[in-house]
């Protein structure tokens, strides 16, 4: 536990100290910044804000985790577990970096195409499975204490889990501070689970990432001076999926990650309903004012009859939902 605190403090300090230099470098080089969605007019003022800040907190958390673990953890199995989780973080970080690079430096608005991104994500998921999951012999899902054997189909579950939550966190990263603190809440919850399980190696990694994210949040809260970019959001989603697998608590991510699930579901429902109504009535209709869900809240709150919500209101609401969901999981696991 002491080492986790040390890792968190070091990561926070390095991340918070380094981020201003990253922002300044971005501005001095006059690198093109984040593009904004025109349908949310209050976001247009953010155009040009430095992005790819995830590069900094990922490098910090990875370096601190490895350094502290190498000097403190002598168990080869524990080091392998940490390296396994870090590998998927790095792989998905590279995918996100490539996507951001094409958008910002090559002026390709779409970045990677959907097919290219999915292919790279699946390749990264396969590497994670065959190098770190398969050798452990895990082939079942823990559901409320019961083992659901999947056999070879566990491979497809891992791919679905990692790719799905990677993209879900990416969708969540749409307003200042939302994704960074939502992930901190999720990581704190998994930190408690790791502590109860005496998985101190995983706890160390969680602590380092929490510290790095909080350092990043000092510059990502409204009004944001920097965004994490795909390099950060894709890696964080993959990390949460990998941690849930490592702790054998896969099902909990559906509740702990309720915000990401809600954001993704809103997009899927909106697209499906629009296509269905266009085919049936000749015109597409919408369930939400705009998706992902945080934009729906921005444009009229929950009811849609009141005033538009500020980003702080949306943040507070969704952070609250995530916190309550996380407390529910801990209560299910350790109280009821």
Swiss-Prot record:
Q: Where's it mainly located?
A: membrane
PANTHER family per record: PHOSPHO-N-ACETYLMURAMOYL-PENTAPEPTIDE-TRANSFERASE, PHOSPHO-N-ACETYLMURAMOYL-PENTAPEPTIDE-TRANSFERASE HOMOLOG
Name the family the entry cites: Belongs to the glycosyltransferase 4 family. MraY subfamily.
PROSITE patterns reported for this sequence: MRAY_2
- Main role? Catalyzes the initial step of the lipid cycle reactions in the biosynthesis of the cell wall peptidoglycan: transfers peptidoglycan precursor phospho-MurNAc-pentapeptide from UDP-MurNAc-pentapeptide onto the lipid carrier undecaprenyl phosphate, yielding undecaprenyl-pyrophosphoryl-MurNAc-pentapeptide, known as lipid I.
Q: From the UniProt record, which GO molecular function terms apply?
A: metal ion binding; phospho-N-acetylmuramoyl-pentapeptide-transferase activity
Q: Where are the transmembrane segments?
A: 3-23, 53-73, 78-98, 118-138, 143-163, 174-194, 200-220, 226-246, 251-271, 316-336
Essential cofactor(s)? Mg(2+)
Q: How does it sit in the membrane?
A: Multi-pass membrane protein
Gene Ontology CC terms: plasma membrane
* Protein location: Cell membrane
Superkingdom of origin organism: Bacteria
List the cysteine pairs that form cystine. none
| Lineage start | Bacteria, Bacillati, Bacillota, Bacilli, Lactobacillales
> By what name is this protein known?
Phospho-N-acetylmuramoyl-pentapeptide-transferase
Please name the top-level EC class of this enzyme. Answer: transferase
This entry's Enzyme Commission designation comes to: 2.7.8.13
Pathway in which the depicted protein is active? Cell wall biogenesis; peptidoglycan biosynthesis
Keyword annotations for this protein, in alphabetical order, are: Cell cycle, Cell division, Cell membrane, Cell shape, Cell wall biogenesis/degradation, Magnesium, Membrane, Metal-binding, Peptidoglycan synthesis, Transferase, Transmembrane, Transmembrane helix
**Biological process annotations from GO:** cell division; cell wall organization; peptidoglycan biosynthetic process; regulation of cell shape
> Where are the annotated coiled coils located?
none
Q: Which reaction does it catalyse?
A: UDP-N-acetyl-alpha-D-muramoyl-L-alanyl-gamma-D-glutamyl-L-lysyl-D-alanyl-D-alanine + di-trans,octa-cis-undecaprenyl phosphate = Mur2Ac(oyl-L-Ala-gamma-D-Glu-L-Lys-D-Ala-D-Ala)-di-trans,octa-cis-undecaprenyl diphosphate + UMP
Q: Quote the Pfam families the UniProt record gives.
A: Glycos_transf_4, MraY_sig1
InterPro entries reported in the protein's UniProt record: Glycosyl_transferase_4, PNAcMuramoyl-5peptid_Trfase, PNAcMuramoyl-5peptid_Trfase_CS
């Amino acid at each position: 536990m002491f080492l986790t605190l040390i890792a968190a403090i070091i990561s926070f300090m390095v991340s918070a100290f380094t981020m201003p230099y990253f922002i300044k470098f971005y501005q001095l080089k006059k690198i093109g910044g984040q593009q904004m969605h025109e349908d949310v007019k209050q976001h247009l003022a953010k155009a040009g804000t430095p992005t790819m800040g995830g590069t900094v907190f990922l490098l910090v958390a990875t370096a601190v985790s490895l350094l502290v673990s190498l000097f403190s953890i002598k168990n080869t199995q524990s080091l392998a577990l940490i390296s396994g989780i870090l590998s998927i973080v790095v792989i998905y970080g590279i995918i996100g970096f490539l996507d951001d690079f094409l958008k910002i430096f090559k002026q390709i608005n779409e970045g990677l195409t959907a097919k290219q991104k999915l292919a790279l994500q699946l390749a990264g998921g396969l590497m994670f499975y065959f190098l770190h999951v398969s050798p452990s012999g895990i082939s079942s899902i823990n559901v409320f204490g019961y083992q659901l054997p999947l056999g070879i189909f566990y491979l497809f579950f891992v791919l679905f889990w990692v790719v799905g939550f990677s993209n879900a966190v990416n969708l969540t990263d749409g307003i200042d501070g939302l994704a960074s603190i939502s992930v901190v809440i999720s990581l704190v919850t998994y930190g408690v689970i790791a502590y109860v399980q005496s998985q101190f190696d995983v706890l160390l990694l969680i602590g380092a990432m929490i510290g790095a994210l909080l350092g990043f949040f000092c510059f990502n809260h409204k009004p944001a001076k920097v965004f994490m970019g795909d390099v950060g959001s894709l890696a964080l989603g993959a990390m949460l999926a990998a941690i849930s697998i490592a702790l054998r608590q896969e099902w909990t991510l559906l509740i702990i990650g309720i915000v990401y699930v809600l954001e993704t579901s809103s997009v899927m429902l909106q697209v499906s309903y629009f296509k269905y109504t266009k085919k049936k009535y000749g015109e597409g209709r919408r369930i939400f004012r705009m998706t992902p869900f945080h934009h729906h809240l921005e444009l009229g709150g929950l009811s849609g009859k009141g005033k538009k919500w500020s980003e702080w209101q949306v943040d507070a609401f969704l952070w609250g939902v995530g916190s309550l969901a996380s407390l529910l999981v801990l209560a299910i696991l350790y109280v009821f």
